[in-house]
């Protein structure tokens, strides 16, 4: 009886959370990413060096549907280390770029942010996408260049740590924020990142 009460309490708590999330996604309008364009198609057709798994293709299709809905997307992507979450994140960012928006990826540690930057930069340079790295140890001159590139739109994809939350970090047209290990960030921090857009 005690186990059943605990189970029911947890079940109804989860149901309440799900209801709130559904309500928020209906209330909060998002950008409409109506097309998959040159960046996505060029990388997929000419530069992808391994076949995507069925699960990766399915998730990318689901994300594309969410991004085209006009509602704010709040999606959790789970997988083991090395399961291909980074390539899914990269394709998702390319959809944002193909629709004229910028994207950012926030990681909880400088080591993880640097790993993402190195992996994604290698892929991005093949299709002419400009990627930046912003962490707590980024030098002042580099920060200024990053800030200028974000505001004029020449820096299309920014990867970093909590440094992305600084007030000085503003975008010309931020359309997508990807948060790695989102459980390591507070709700207020995630919301602050979502609000970063000068338009």
Segments the model singles out, each with a brief description of its role:
Residues 74, 88-117, 125-130:
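Conserved SF1/SF2 helicase motif Ia
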